[in-house]
């Protein structure tokens, strides 16, 4: 038999979840005997299991948290570069995963993982960074040159991640899918 309990974790936790795009309340499930629980992603993509250990925090895009064991904590992570929030697709409010246990996150599309060396940088289209080790730094950089900005079709800004640490890039963020499909919908007058 499975027991379910809904809890907000206090006003501070609820406000933090509101900022990071999560649901305000969490459901806790406890099995009185052997049992299984299943969960699904809200968009076609991949569910990724993360083994969380003390001192090895992970930063994920807001609203990517799906489920975790009870000793895993989520908190609001503010990107120190305000320009990242104004111009970047990732925003300056992200979610930090810490504690001990397994956490599940949902990623749009497929994933591609990279291990960055200290000081090594990767330039990514904004909105495509799904996850990074907390040892990585993220910044937003303007696309150089007027020709690139206006004729390149890739947007005005890129996300720059600097190692050391692992990063996970998603191949199909929901925002990119929505933009691609929008041109097929009739425009109202």
Regions found by a protein language model. Name each.
Residues 1-189:
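Phosphate/adenylate-binding glycine loop and adjacent helical scaffold
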């Amino acid at each position: 038999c499975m027991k379910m309990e809904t809890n907000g974790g206090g006003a501070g936790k609820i406000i933090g979840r509101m900022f990071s795009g999560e649901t305000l309340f969490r459901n806790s499930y406890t099995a009185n005997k052997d049992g299984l629980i299943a969960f699904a992603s809200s968009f076609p993509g991949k569910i990724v299991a993360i083994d969380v250990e003390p001192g090895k925090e992970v930063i994920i895009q807001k609203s990517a948290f799906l489920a975790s064991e009870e000793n895993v904590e989520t908190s609001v992570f503010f990107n120190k570069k305000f320009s990242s929030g104004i111009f970047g697709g990732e925003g300056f409010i992200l979610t930090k995963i810490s504690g001990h246990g397994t956490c599940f996150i949902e990623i749009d599309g497929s994933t591609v993982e990279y291990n960055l060396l200290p000081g090594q940088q990767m330039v990514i289209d904004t909105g495509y960074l799904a996850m990074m080790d907390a040892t990585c730094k993220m910044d937003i950089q303007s696309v150089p040159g007027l020709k690139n900005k206006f004729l390149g079709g890739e947007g005005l800004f890129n996300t720059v991640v600097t190692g050391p640490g692992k990063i996970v890039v998603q191949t199909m963020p929901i925002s990119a899918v929505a933009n691609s499909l929008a041109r097929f919908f009739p425009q109202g007058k």
